[in-house]
Amino acid sequence: MSYIKKLRARLDSGEISAVELTKEYLAKIKEQDKRINSVITLCEAEALKEAEDADAIISAGKQGLLTGIPILHKDLFCTKGIRTTAASKMLDNFVAPYDSTVTKNCKDQGMVTLGKLNMDEFAMGSTNEHSYYGAVSNPWDLERVPGGSSGGSAAAVAAGFAPISTGSDTGGSVRQPASFCGLTAMKPSYGSTSRFGMVAFASSFDQAGIFAHYAEDVAIMLDAIAGECEFDSTCVGVKENHFTQDLEKDISGKVIGVDESLIKDLPEQIQEAVLKTLDNFKKLGAEIKSVKVPDLKEALSTYYIITPAEAAANLARYDGIRYGYRNPEARDLDELYRKSRTDGFGAEVKRRIMIGNYVLASSQYDSYYNKAQQLRKVMTDQINQIFTQVDVIFMPASPSEAFKKGDKLDPVSAYLSDIYTIPANISGLPAIAFPIGFANNLPVGGQLMAKAFNDNILTQMVVQYQKHYGIEEFILEQARI
């Protein structure tokens, strides 16, 4: 099941041209995004030019699988000649002079960039309410959040503005929005995709990810954007077809680890969806094995010490001098720094910078940052030990369905939205979220996590699951082809 392959067949048969397809999506965005607010920058002229180029390639019979396929990018991936804002006033007018590796790889495959997507500012948030350009609405219920920080990426695909979008995942920022919007999304192993040209939040956690309706499309796209990059020393790359190599194989004999203590406290409807999903996996031949995952509250605390520290260091570059917003009223250098950063950053970003600077202070370093790094290593070892007994670990993707805007303005309650997704980021492991059911008529997602660079097992298992149990009920009518 693949939207990409359906579109490929239509393009290759001449039923529709890349330009016509692009115009359809652009028209839909212009007509409907006023209600959702998922797109920051619409790249109409650039998209039509790329579509014309794609049509020429198709006419010459030299097309690949992705030639002419439209895509939307989270607005923290640099795009040459197109502004990249990270949803911040600080970068409102920043136009990158180069492409990120992720966007370049998409262009090299002949994809058509429709625009840049809304997000939580500098990817800091779980609701997409922390954006200089306004909150994003969930297409399933416009009064609710789409999740974050890649809320625009999830909302756009759920609304049918593109078949595919890119996102980034630092603590669950593709998986939690996928759960809220009824999508499939994956954070690959740390180091499998390049971070070059991706606006940094927390460099040892950040990783590019993909949103789609179907797991097969996620796998196809991850193969397209993954690989070694000379500009990112942490990117080790993966072999060709790493994510798609096992999609046709059945999952009989695969062992799924489940920590029952993580299920018993879930809301009843989500608990029922989880148990039904595990039963479906058993029907496909998988074995369920009881395991004990590390304490999730400790993982949450570890994450919210280390990531603000890394963010404080990364965001120090935005000083009003080199690039970014500059306060026009500053009278001296100190005032320029202070006013530019005070005005240029939103409240949530400033909160995390302050936390980061506090835990990095010499008087607090050993008590907070150093201990958190030690705990990160212990947790990673504990999780990897589980993988000596099982192939994957199953967890919910979120403790709830999408909640209403304004319900979690208290930062601590918002941070708890990431409690099931953070372990994969702490340990650098791959994890995929996929729709498993409904709670209060809203989609909810499950999550599989695997050993580092065993990404192919995750895509295999979810592709086979969706092949047998389908996901059509999770696709909004407006998003259907």
From Swiss-Prot:
Asked if the Swiss-Prot or TrEMBL record annotates the protein with the keyword Transit peptide, the reply is no
The family classification in the record reads: Belongs to the amidase family. GatA subfamily.
Organism source for this protein? Answer: Francisella tularensis subsp. novicida (strain U112)
Q: Which reaction does it catalyse?
A: L-glutamyl-tRNA(Gln) + L-glutamine + ATP + H2O = L-glutaminyl-tRNA(Gln) + L-glutamate + ADP + phosphate + H(+)
Identify which residues the record assigns to the active site: 74, 149, 173
Which Pfam family, any one of them, does this sequence belong to?
Answer: Amidase
Do you know which Gene3D superfamilies this protein is assigned to? Amidase signature (AS) domain
| Its EC number(s) | 6.3.5.7
Keywords from the UniProt entry = ATP-binding, Ligase, Nucleotide-binding, Protein biosynthesis
User: Which purpose does this protein serve, as stated in its record?
Assistant: Allows the formation of correctly charged Gln-tRNA(Gln) through the transamidation of misacylated Glu-tRNA(Gln) in organisms which lack glutaminyl-tRNA synthetase. The reaction takes place in the presence of glutamine and ATP through an activated gamma-phospho-Glu-tRNA(Gln).
Q: Which GO terms describe its biological process?
A: translation
- Top-level taxon of origin: Bacteria
Output this protein's name: Glutamyl-tRNA(Gln) amidotransferase subunit A
Q: What GO terms are given for molecular function? A: ATP binding; glutaminyl-tRNA synthase (glutamine-hydrolyzing) activity
| Subunit field text | Heterotrimer of A, B and C subunits.
Lineage of the organism = Bacteria, Pseudomonadati, Pseudomonadota, Gammaproteobacteria, Thiotrichales
Kindly state one GO CC term assigned in the UniProt record.
Answer: glutamyl-tRNA(Gln) amidotransferase complex
